[in-house]
Amino acid sequence: MKKLTKKQNLFKTFLNHTKKYDIDEGITLLKKMATSKFIESLDVAINLGINPKNTNQNIRNTTILPHGIGRLIKVAVFTQGENEKIAKKFGAEFVGLHNLIETVKTKTILFDVAIATPDVMPYVSQLGPILGPRGLMPNPKLGTITEKLEYAIKNAKSGQIHYKNDKNGIIHISIGKINFENTKIKENLNALISSLKQSKPSQSKGTYIKQVVISTTMSSGIKIDLNTLNNAS
């Protein structure tokens, strides 16, 4: 029989995989199991009552987490002229058009969010095969194709996240770091769930928030009792 690693033994000691934990208990358990030398991200997987094969039920949206995700968000802005000065003024790390496009073509991507003004989208559209699979392609529905650069950059840097369901109808997203206070983790999670409920497709019937599982970068998942979340029912 293969010997369990120290980390696996730790999970086995603390975790009952069949149990649904109170949110506070679940967060506390994750903190006990987070023994890595780096500060692990705190991730959530939310199983939704949607049919992902039906395009009308697929979900893609943004929301702002009240406490951010615990790291500096680097923003790229594709634009030209006076808008370049505006983007730099409000803190975008990478600003420009043709030079920035050529950099991305080399697959050197050092930013977390890409924003573009509408006038340059005919140029930026060629980056779809590179930025699209990474979830970085500017999109008007996500507020990342806009003339309002100040607003878009501030949102990106203040904890705005972009989420969409996978082919199984599950949302996977980071909502912070394991060293966040429990209250801040819960408030971030509740903000996400509130946004998801507002995005519920009219065609979705029955239970919408079916399951919530929290984990860290290196841990097993912990199922959460939905009754202990403020707005998941």
Curated annotation (Swiss-Prot):
Quaternary structure annotation from Swiss-Prot or TrEMBL: Part of the 50S ribosomal subunit.
Signal peptide location: none
Function text: Binds directly to 23S rRNA. The L1 stalk is quite mobile in the ribosome, and is involved in E site tRNA release.
Annotated keywords: Repressor, Ribonucleoprotein, Ribosomal protein, RNA-binding, rRNA-binding, Translation regulation, tRNA-binding
GO-annotated biological processes: regulation of translation; translation
Similarity comment text for this entry: Belongs to the universal ribosomal protein uL1 family.
MF term (GO), any: tRNA binding
InterPro entries hit by this protein: Ribosom_uL1_bac-type, Ribosomal_uL1, Ribosomal_uL1-like, Ribosomal_uL1/biogenesis, Ribosomal_uL1_3-a/b-sand, Ribosomal_uL1_CS
UniProt keyword Magnesium, yes or no: no
Protein name: Large ribosomal subunit protein uL1
SUPFAM superfamilies assigned to the protein according to its UniProt record, in alphabetical order: Ribosomal protein L1 (SSF56808)
GO cellular component: cytosolic large ribosomal subunit
